[in-house]
Amino acid sequence: MRIIVIGRTGFIAPHIVDRLCERGHDVVDDEGGVADAVVCVHAFTQEDAEAAVRLFRGRTGKLVVLSSGDVYRAYGVLKGIETRELEPVPITEDSRLRTTLYPYRNDPKFADYEKILVERTVMNVSDLPACILRLPAVYGPGDRHHRFGNWVKQMVDGSPMIQIGAGMAGWRWTHGYVENVADAIVLAATDRRTGGRIYNIGEEVVPTTRERLEAFAQIFGWSGTVEVVPDDMALDFRQDMAVSTARFRRELGYADLISVEEAVSRTIAWERSALTG
């Protein structure tokens, strides 16, 4: 297949390109050409989505757009921008979306960010089949957020104790290892059944934050203790962000190629090298 990847820099996109090439697909930079599928990595605003529709309408068989779990009402509850009524978990593709738009309006860099409007824009075009992938918290080598860097640093430093807030300790948030997420994106781009579909992406099992920390500790070989301490509850951690990925796995036969244990091991190794590099 001939596939265009828009937004080829950054954390996830290089893995997408690598996997497409490994599978024998023709990955091209020509945004003015014709393609079997287009993967739009960096569509953050309604304007971004409208530009993609204008550019590729009539020139591709499918537009795959990366979205986020922050579209769900559960995220608004967590952030305190929706009413405090909790959403049931696991969150499915049919769960309620936020009613309050622009969740990062107070941040000038992301004031116009809104994946709900991105999704709405591309899914409402009758002659441009689209597939929406709602991504989890993505981790692994190259993660500019260093999601687990603080844990690894404390383990490297030989800290006897790692503290974690009481609210976060029992909170569940779906994550995904970057190479597995890239594999899922490639499958969605190359499988002809995904047009018009919305899928959650991420690991099948969602541990609590404490359980995740303990898994890191075991794989690292850290023998300290985890201490749960009071936190200021800036977020409403009563609301889990655990999503179901059953639809994607069932409809497309998807399974993670890299185990959680191996993903954590690779992440630890990268974080350790980042500390010394």
Region spans (language model):
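N-terminal Rossmann NAD(P)H-binding glycine-rich loop of SDR-like oxidoreductase domains
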Residues: 2-25
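Conserved Rossmann-fold NAD(P)-dependent oxidoreductase catalytic core, especially the SDR/UDP-sugar
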Residues: 51-116, 123, 131
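Conserved beta-loop-beta element that borders a ligand/cofactor-binding pocket
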Residues: 118-142
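Substrate-binding strand-loop-helix patch
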Residues: 142, 170-179, 198-219, 258, ...
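A conserved pocket-lining segment of Rossmann-fold NAD(P)-dependent short-chain dehydrogenase/reductase
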Residues: 154-176
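Conserved C-terminal active-site "lid" loop/helix of NAD(P)H-dependent oxidoreductases
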Residues: 178, 232-255
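Mid/C-terminal beta-alpha module of Rossmann-like enzyme folds, strongest
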Residues: 184-234
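Amphipathic terminal alpha-helices
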Residues: 259-277
